[in-house]
Each structure stands twice: as structure tokens, then as C-alpha cells.
Regions:
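Short catalytic/signature loops enriched in Gly
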Residues: 3, 142-148, 239-289, 300-303, ...
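Conserved ABC ATPase "signature" region
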Residues: 75, 127-146, 354, 407-424, ...
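Conserved ABC ATPase signature
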Residues: 150-155, 159, 429-433, 437
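The feature captures the beta-strand-to-loop junction immediately N-terminal to the Walker
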Residues: 40-41, 323-325
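Conserved signature/switch motifs of ABC ATPase nucleotide-binding domains
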Residues: 89, 153, 171, 449
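Conserved ABC transporter NBD signature motif
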Residues: 64-75, 346-357
């Protein structure tokens, strides 16, 4: 196969207040015609910077220091900016990580597709509209003419990602760069988007670079994989070979940290970090009983029944998984249980009392507030950027625990030790912490008041696999040490399989199936559960050393 893209000795640096920082350090690779190349690695590995360098859209301070990048005979590094404007979109196009950030919120999506068409093909307004609608149909958007006039905020995350795909593919580029195209999407939407991208690439005889931290996704959709660490390619090869028999220690670490069938939560960690396994004690005594819970919102076209008469029980010490696609009602259920909003009807029996009788806006002053806490999906968004880790952990202790002085300081340091946060990080702000460190701060804040029940809302969704492994093991240990009960909200069925004793599957506001985790995962009864399991990426098995 002839190379469509050839990269040789590419080096990229950023100028910072502390001096020059090398982000990409002399990497070389090729992309053949018709090939899907995966670039995998954790945050800071240089994979996204590589793609931005190829497109010549580096952030301020970024400079290509050395190397060459040649696309179909065109020198991308030395082409003029005017030439690059023609190349972007028409020859090389990009799907960005956050679809909502990539779309203009105050312009109709159809007009945003037209912009690309009119710039690159000089189409008339009439022709551009027809081609924009055709682009929407190509990415399998139903009722494309109506969606043409929609604004991004009127569409789901999966729909917005399809719009971004339509924009990227509108001018029939020959090379598509997809930068974390499924981050934040539920599992069936992720599969639909990736199947769509793969099929369009095959139909149009394109090439593609898939940038991701999800090795399972790369293994399923890529012809070849590069593994990057600290700006360097440490290994490359066939996905099955890399997954089954990784040669580099970093590749082995990533592969072992990827949840899949046949693994347990301790095996995600390197052997030297596993320690003694702590086994949670699950009681037969119910801690939380939800009975016939309903939530109805007032919508423009009539009432919206978000939660429809659901019932379930969580025992003391038990971890229950709540899974389903976006819009199934799991987040609404979580917010009702943590008393951020009121139910329309139903009972929430917590430790013998019906807390649904206490209005949500008054629950902060209720004595049971400390017993129910939440760990949020995005640790960055859930932390006050102006508060240090110490101040964040101290807040519930001051407000609800009435702690002050030496006692407060001692408790903060005790909590930091409990979640594995070095004391040296207590006086740092969120922007000075890694994703895993921010997750530890959020967990420390949640357990500060010794709650009985934690709601975990996608707590590892935005984390790299090795950091996810550490956080999952921390949650298992805390559950055993503190006797906590969890409601674990997630769309990652591999993680739910590892962590949860019991699973609840929701669809359209209803529970379609629930039962013991292993039973649900190995022998699902509902067609919907079967669909969710079929959509989950299936990484190749790891070959065990003799």
C-alpha cells in the first residue's frame, strides 16, 4: 500500500513561562490509503498535539521544531497558510473531541455545514443547502431537512457528534482525523458513531487517524495502532498483537488497565501496586428502598415523564450499578435520590425514613444530609477553581460538621491519606492537579462526613485507563473500610461488571431488567440489555506469560 501521509522525525514544542516544553519528540509514521491508524496514549502523551501539528492549528506558543509531514506530495509543514486553508476540510478534515464546543451555539447546524461547502466548493446558496441536507442524510440523521434548521442545544450529544461528522465529511476529504470522537457518549451512541465513521471511510476510500485513550475502541476499529508516551512512539503494530502480547512496559500497563471480560478490579493495577484485597461486607438489611418513583417535567409539547414508577433496593454495603443510554432517566433518578430535586410521586425510604417527604430545597438543613453524598462525573467542573484541595475538603466539614482549628486540619489530612492524596497537594488549586488527583479530592470531599450512601455519577468516564484503574480500586477499598453503599451510574458495562454486585438497566424512564451483576452480564433477558452488551467494545484477550 502506498502512503497517503508520511511523517518523519516530527518534533513539537510549546513556549511556557518555565521555558520550552517538548510535546512531540521526533516521531515517524505513515498512513496508507484506505487504512485506519489508531494513536493511543494517556493525557499528555502528545497524540492530539500530533494531529494539531499536521493540521497546522497548534495552540498559542506551539511550534513545529523539526521534521517533515508530507500528504500526497504536499509539504504540510512548509505550505503557506493560504494553501493550508484550502487543504483543511477539502483534503484533510478533523472531528474534534467535544462536539458542542466544535459547533457554534447560535447558528443553525445546516448553516454551519454550508459554510464549509461554500468556502471549499464555491457552491451557490441553493446548492450548498441541498448538499448540506445530503451530508446530514449521509451520517444517518433522520428527517434531515428539519434537523438542518436545528440549533446545537436542541440536539443530543450523539446527534451533535453526527453533525460534526457531516461537517468534516461534507467536502469528501481523503484523510479524516478523529480526535477522541466518542468521549462522553453512551455506549450504543459510541458504537453508532464509530460504525458510521468506519463505513463512510470504507465507502469513500478514505484514510483515517483515530486518536483515543480507549484501547478497546482502537482494537475494534483500527488496522494498526501506535502507542505514545511522553511525546514518543513506544510501540506500534497490529491491534491483536499489541493487545495479546504487548512488548513495551507502558503498552502492557495500558492493556492490563483496560477492563474486559475475565478481569477483576485488582488485576487492572500493576502487580507492585495491588496490595491486599479488601472485601466489602454486604448486609441483608436495606439501606435505601425506592418505591414507585415518578418524575414528570413540564415540556413545550406536553408533560415529559422522565422516570416512570421505578422501584429498587440497595442493601447496606452493597454496590448497585445503574446503566442505560443518555435520556433513560438515570441522572434524574440520581438527582432525586441525593435530594437535588423533588420527585413527582413515590417513596424514598432511607435508613427507615421516607426522605421524599422532605423538600429538596430544605434537605441541606436536614440531619440526614451528611449521610447521602455524591461524586460527580467531571472532577474539574465539580471543583471550585478558586479553592485549594484543602479548602474543598474542608467545606463540608465546616458547614455540616462544624469543625474548626486543629481538629479540622487533622481531619483533612486524615482524609487525604485515606484517598491517597499526598499532603503536598492540599494547597494546590484544581488547575495544578492531574485528572486522577482531582478525582481523589472529589472523593475525599464526598466521604468527609462519613456518609452511609454514595452516588457515583460516571466518576471515571473522563479518566485515562491507568488512572481509572487506581480510582476504581480506591472506591472498592473505601467501600470495604467505611462500610459504604454505592449507586454507581455508568454507561461502561465493563466497569459495572467489575465493581457492582447488582445491576439495574433503565430505558425511557423505566427499569427493563435488574438482578445480580454476573447474571445480568452473562445471561441478559431483556433485548435492550442484550443491545447494550453487544455495543460494548471487546478488546482482544491478553496472552498470559508462562
Amino acid at each position: 500500500m502506498s502512503a497517503m501521509l508520511s511523517v518523519k522525525d516530527l518534533a513539537v514544542s510549546f513556549q511556557t513561562r518555565r521555558g520550552e516544553v517538548g510535546a512531540v519528540k521526533g516521531i515517524s509514521f505513515e498512513v496508507s490509503k484506505g487504512e485506519i491508524l489508531g494513536i493511543v496514549g494517556e493525557s499528555g502523551s502528545g497524540k492530539s498535539v500530533t494531529s494539531y501539528a499536521l493540521m497546522r492549528i497548534l495552540d498559542a506558543g506551539g511550534v513545529i521544531k523539526a521534521g517533515d509531514a508530507t500528504y500526497s506530495g504536499i509539504d504540510l509543514r512548509r505550505s503557506s497558510e493560504r494553501d493550508m486553508r484550502d487543504i483543511r476540510g477539502r483534503e484533510i478534515s478533523m472531528i474534534f473531541q467535544n462536539p458542542r464546543a466544535a459547533l457554534n451555539p447560535i447558528r443553525k447546524v445546516g448553516h454551519q455545514i454550508e459554510d464549509v461547502l461554500r468556502h471549499h466548493s464555491r457552491a451557490t446558496r441553493y446548492d450548498a443547502k441541498a448538499k448540506a441536507i445530503a451530508a446530514l442524510e449521509a451520517v444517518k440523521i433522520n428527517d434531515a431537512e428539519a434537523r438542518y434548521n436545528a440549533y446545537p442545544f436542541e440536539l443530543s450529544g450523539g446527534m451533535c457528534q453526527r453533525i460534526v461528522c457531516a461537517i468534516a465529511l461534507a467536502c469528501d476529504p481523503r484523510l479524516l482525523i478523529a480526535d477522541e470522537p466518542t468521549t462522553g457518549l453512551d455506549i450504543t451512541t459510541q458504537k453508532a458513531v464509530m460504525d458510521l465513521v468506519r463505513d463512510l471511510i470504507r465507502e469513500r476510500s478514505m484514510s483515517s487517524i483515530l486518536i483515543t485513550h480507549d484501547l478497546g475502541l482502537a482494537a475494534q476499529y483500527c488496522d494498526r495502532i501506535l502507542v505514545m508516551k511522553d511525546g514518543v512512539i513506544v510501540e506500534q503494530g497490529d491491534p491483536v498483537q499489541i493487545f495479546s502480547n504487548p512488548q513495551h512496559s507502558y503498552s502492557r500497563k495500558l492493556v492490563d488497565a483496560t477492563p474486559r471480560v475475565g478481569t477483576d478490579v485488582r488485576s487492572l493495577l500493576p502487580p507492585e501496586d495491588r496490595g491486599d484485597e479488601l472485601v466489602p461486607v454486604v448486609s441483608d438489611r436495606p439501606l435505601l428502598e425506592v418505591r414507585d418513583l415518578n418524575k414528570i417535567y413540564a415540556g413545550k409539547s406536553g408533560p415529559v415523564h422522565a422516570v416512570k414508577g421505578i422501584s429498587f433496593t440497595i442493601n447496606q454495603g452493597q454496590c448497585v450499578g445503574l446503566v442505560g443510554e443518555s435520556g433513560c432517566g438515570k441522572s434524574t433518578t440520581s438527582e432525586i435520590l441525593v435530594r437535588l430535586m423533588d420527585a413527582t410521586s413515590g417513596e424514598i425510604i432511607f435508613d427507615g425514613d421516607d426522605i421524599a417527604q422532605v423538600p429538596a430545597n430544605g434537605f441541606a438543613k436536614d440531619g440526614r444530609r451528611a449521610d447521602i453524598q455524591m461524586v460527580f462525573q467531571d472532577a474539574t467542573d465539580s471543583l471550585n477553581p478558586r479553592h485549594t484541595s484543602r479548602q474543598t475538603i474542608a467545606e463540608p466539614l465546616r458547614r455540616l460538621g462544624k469543625m474548626r482549628g486543629v481538629k479540622l486540619t487533622a481531619r483533612i489530612e486524615e482524609l487525604a491519606a485515606l484517598v491517597g492524596l499526598p499532603l503536598s497537594l492540599l494547597d494546590r488549586f484544581p488547575h495544578q492537579l492531574s485528572g486522577g488527583q482531582k478525582a481523589r479530592v472529589g472523593i475525599a470531599r464526598a466521604v468527609a462526613l462519613e456518609p452511609k450512601f454514595l452516588i457515583l455519577d460516571e466518576p471515571t468516564a473522563a479518566l485515562d485507563v491507568s488512572i481509572q484503574a487506581v480510582v476504581l480500586n480506591l472506591l472498592v477499598d473505601l467501600r470495604a473500610k467505611l462500610g459504604l453503599s454505592y449507586l454507581f451510574v455508568s454507561h461502561d458495562l465493563h466497569v459495572v461488571r467489575l465493581l457492582c454486585d447488582h445491576v439495574i438497566v433503565m430505558k425511557d424512564g423505566e427499569i427493563v431488567e435488574q438482578g445480580p451483576s454476573q447474571e445480568i452480564m452473562s445471561n441478559p433477558q431483556s433485548d435492550y440489555t442484550k443491545t447494550l452488551l453487544a455495543a460494548a467494545p471487546k478488546p482482544p484477550a491478553r496472552r498470559q506469560a508462562n
